[in-house]
Amino acid sequence: MTGVSHRFPCRVYYEDTDHGGVVYYANYLKFMERGRTEYLRSAGIELDSIEKDKGVMFAVTEANVRYLSPALFNDLLEVESTLTHARGARLTFNQQIWCIHRKHKTRDTLLTEAEIKLACIDRDGNARRIPASLIPVLNIHQTKELANG
């Protein structure tokens, strides 16, 4: 279940920046959250549905982030998310945020990289195993991604 990447484009808006037009450091975590959500959505996993139907959700328990270069107002970014671990009650993602070159529309600069660990929890905040029905969905998604890659 490792090695499959999902790419999510996003734009830096004024609200994401400080007074100097540089992305505020905590906002990279928001971009990564969106990237993980879209990764799971592309695998057919809707986070609101699993909370409603299975009574579980995923909570970040650890974020190890390296800031390498700043993103600026109006930059086009690409969040790459790779699921590297799914076992028991834990998911681990490696994520990178790239700046996309304005003219060539290709990756230009690696801005941020992170390892994000999540726990599967119930509505009371207690750890729960990842529902067995979600694991095959992720495996099917991986097979599709590898076939399309």
Predicted regions and their residues:
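Hot-dog-fold acyl-thioester-processing enzymes
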Residues: 2-59, 121-149
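Preference for bulky hydrophobic residues occupying beta-strand positions
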Residues: 10-12, 65, 81, 95, ...
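HotDog/MaoC-like acyl-thioester-processing domains
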Residues: 5, 41, 71-76, 84-149
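Short, well-ordered turn and helix-capping elements at secondary-structure junctions
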Residues: 12-16, 62-69, 101
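Helix-adjacent hinge/juxtasegments
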Residues: 57-83
